[in-house]
Amino acid sequence: MSRRHRAEKREINPDPKFGDLVVTKFMNAIMLDGKKSVAESIVYGAFEAVQSKLKQEPVAVFHSALDNIAPHVEVRSRRVGGATYQVPVDVRPERRQALAIRWLIAAARKRNETTMVDRLCGELMDAANNRGSAVKKREDTHKMADANRAFSHYRW
């Protein structure tokens, strides 16, 4: 790890339609090969589909989905005297958001619908209702941390 200065946090602009920074981060995470307009059309298309199906504000559904996916604790490996322990640690708020976004996109990409708009819409609605594979991933992470609670005194 470099001993020089840390990379500065880049400032990102809120998305043009909703004026939300988290939506912009989500778009940037969906984007492949620098194709921002494609990522925008996917996200906005999924939001429109959510609004037509649920008759709710799509950004509110998106934020509740992220809250339901974001983990509170995770396990990190810690080597102590020849043995490696999975030590449960609290997750920082920035990392919680990043993990939630990453897990939501991964779960959406694994779904069986034909277009990414449909997959993302389905996963957003599932996550907002505490269902879906992204929420399952969070539950598994919490179970793993709970199972290794005995090693929590190895925190750093």
From Swiss-Prot:
PROSITE patterns in the record: RIBOSOMAL_S7
A GO CC term attached to the entry: small ribosomal subunit
GO molecular function ontology, one term from the record: tRNA binding
Keyword Heme: no
Full protein name: Small ribosomal subunit protein uS7
Keyword hit for rRNA-binding: yes
UniProt family annotation: Belongs to the universal ribosomal protein uS7 family.
InterPro entries linked to this entry: Ribosomal_uS7, Ribosomal_uS7_bac/org-type, Ribosomal_uS7_CS, Ribosomal_uS7_dom, Ribosomal_uS7_dom_sf
Keywords: Ribonucleoprotein, Ribosomal protein, RNA-binding, rRNA-binding, tRNA-binding
Organism: Sinorhizobium fredii (strain NBRC 101917 / NGR234)
SUBUNIT field: Part of the 30S ribosomal subunit. Contacts proteins S9 and S11.
Protein task: One of the primary rRNA binding proteins, it binds directly to 16S rRNA where it nucleates assembly of the head domain of the 30S subunit. Is located at the subunit interface close to the decoding center, probably blocks exit of the E-site tRNA.
Family annotation (HAMAP family): Ribosomal_uS7_B
Any one GO biological process: translation
